[in-house]
């Protein structure tokens, strides 16, 4: 379940999907003779939110202040436990991949900045932006995806020990504010998006 606000509305569904879903996938994978590598893609929201200025490191504590984030932290812990308890002994490579603020690729889910801007343009509505000055590590979906595929290949070929957790993100200087993204999309369109903070 990939949506933060939805996790507040449906916490049981969120935990059931993200926690037990992970358990069921890993259990099925370890019993399938053909599986040789697993990459569980979670999120950069899996960390205990420290509100500090630098990026999180792979060995920082898991946490989360909301059902979505904490469920993804749990998925990470489950993956680590399965890797150590079962998968390593069975020769299955296991890694988790964490990326945040991925854009592009046809993601039209609710509460996604770029789709919300496009919808507001089409419907000529005022867009409500929660936190316009928040700085986010924006990246196009193909950027982390190429990393996930490379990680899966290395796990499969056993080229090196890449099992464990991996963060995928842009360089620090490429992180931009929500407002910056909204303004760039406004500039690209003949109509402007009127936005207000809420």
Report residues per predicted region.
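Residue-level signal for the nucleotide or nucleotide-sugar donor/cofactor binding architecture
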Residues: 9, 17-20, 66, 108, ...
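A short beta-to-alpha transition loop/helix N-cap that caps and shapes the active-site region
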Residues: 48-50, 106, 176-177
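C-terminal substrate-binding subdomain of Rossmann-fold SDR/epimerase-dehydratase oxidoreductases
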Residues: 101, 121-198
């Amino acid at each position: 379940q990939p949506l933060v606000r939805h996790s507040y509305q449906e916490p049981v569904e969120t935990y059931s999907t993200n926690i037990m879903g992970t358990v069921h996938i890993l259990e099925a994978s370890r019993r399938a003779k053909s599986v040789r590598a697993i990459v569980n893609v979670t999120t950069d929201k899996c960390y205990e939110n420290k509100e500090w200025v630098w990026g999180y490191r792979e060995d920082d504590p898991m946490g989360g202040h909301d059902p979505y984030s904490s469920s993804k932290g749990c998925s990470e812990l489950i993956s680590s436990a399965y890797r150590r308890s079962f998968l390593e002994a069975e020769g299955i490579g296991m890694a988790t991949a964490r990326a945040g603020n991925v854009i592009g690729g046809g993601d039209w889910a609710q509460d996604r900045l770029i789709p919300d801007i496009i919808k507001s343009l089409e419907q000529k509505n005022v867009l409500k932006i929660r936190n316009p000055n928040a700085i986010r590590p924006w990246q196009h979906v193909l950027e982390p995806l190429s990393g996930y595929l490379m990680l899966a290949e290395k796990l499969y070929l056993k080229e090196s020990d890449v099992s464990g957790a991996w963060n995928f993100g842009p360089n620090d200087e490429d992180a931009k504010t929500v407002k910056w993204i909204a303004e760039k999309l406004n500039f690209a369109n003949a109509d402007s998006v009127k936005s207000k903070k809420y």
